Amino acid sequence: MNDYTQQLQGKKDYLKTLFAGLDVPEWEVYESPDKHYRMRAEFRIWHEGGEMFYAMFEKGQKASGASMIRCDRFEAASEAVNRLMPELIAAAAQSPELKKRWYAVEFLSTLSGEMLVTMIYHKRLDAEWMQAAQALQQQLDISVIGRSRGQKIVLKQDYVTETLKVGNRDFRYRQIEGSFTQPNAAVCQKMLEWACRTAEGLGSDLLELYCGNGNFTLPLSRYFRQVLATEISKTSVSAAQWNIEANRIGNIKIARLSAEEFTEAYTGKREFKRLKDGGIALTDYAFSTIFVDPPRAGIDEETLKLVSQFDNIIYISCNPETLRANLDTLAETHAVERAALFDQFPFTHHIESGVLLKKKIL
């Protein structure tokens, strides 16, 4: 058993133990490549003895020379990131403006190799820095953003455009710097395909909470008459709207509401001008299914009451502990029909999972 298989087996065993006592079918398992799977990576820039290099630090330890790990390569990151790393550091080392007080760097790449690089500084960025960064951008064929306290300088664009293949169709996604995107594109495609398979035959309308940039919304829209998706982040809503238009999808509407706010709107406790302004009338929808991909804290108690009202629940989770806690409640009204482990984060303790629940016939 190699290192990758061994760590994946550990995750399978953990899920079986955690969900013991719940009626859960055999876990479907979706593997990751064992290297070059992360589309995002971030490093400190370490300056020592006239040299400059990428660095990380031992987990749980204060950032210092004693805990520092030099990273000339990073196998977890995409091949595009690994190709760029030495070129970027070498080019920046030749420019006093780029090198001085350069503190950290963030890479955001795509499967096609498009690259956005955010250079973070402990100094004010001026016209000389911009001129040097423009030259760097042109030399390396990348997009550069400069950040410092109170400053964000976008030289060309602050996003990349990812293309993910789901079944027989390609979907284009604008991924904006600083906003959440799934880091493992290969596994993300498997997650999208799994979600679409679970949605087959459910029909009617779909409600999605926590939709982000529309990652799941776009491919799932093919299986429903109408889709209403909610998201609180303005940046993510903007990206989702662009993604809907770019993919020429006509049956999705986005509401900029938190899950808690939508619950209040759905139950009639509050009216929201944002819904009215968006031309959204909840009475126009006949929801058969709800899709949720909540943050690590899971679904709050009031939203869970809302979720339990739907016939079908597709639940993607980045925290199996809160998924288990939520399922303890949902199991009173629903049965788990499918369960999947997605190895989004190889060689870490993090586990991404998905379940399909259907309302019990009492």
From Swiss-Prot:
Identification of the protein by name: tRNA/tmRNA (uracil-C(5))-methyltransferase
GO biological process: tRNA methylation
Function: Dual-specificity methyltransferase that catalyzes the formation of 5-methyluridine at position 54 (m5U54) in all tRNAs, and that of position 341 (m5U341) in tmRNA (transfer-mRNA).
Organism: Neisseria meningitidis serogroup B (strain ATCC BAA-335 / MC58)
Catalytic reaction equation(s): uridine(54) in tRNA + S-adenosyl-L-methionine = 5-methyluridine(54) in tRNA + S-adenosyl-L-homocysteine + H(+); uridine(341) in tmRNA + S-adenosyl-L-methionine = 5-methyluridine(341) in tmRNA + S-adenosyl-L-homocysteine + H(+)
Alphabetized InterPro entries for the sequence: MeTrfase_TrmA_AS, SAM-dependent_MTases_sf, TrmA_MeTrfase, U5_MeTrfase_fam
Encoding gene, per UniProt annotation: trmA
Keyword S-adenosyl-L-methionine found: yes
Active site positions: C318 (nucleophile), E352 (proton acceptor)
Sections of the chain in a coiled coil: none
Residues binding S-adenosyl-L-methionine: Q182, Y210, N215, E231, D293
GO molecular function, one term: tRNA (uracil(54)-C5)-methyltransferase activity, S-adenosyl methionine-dependent
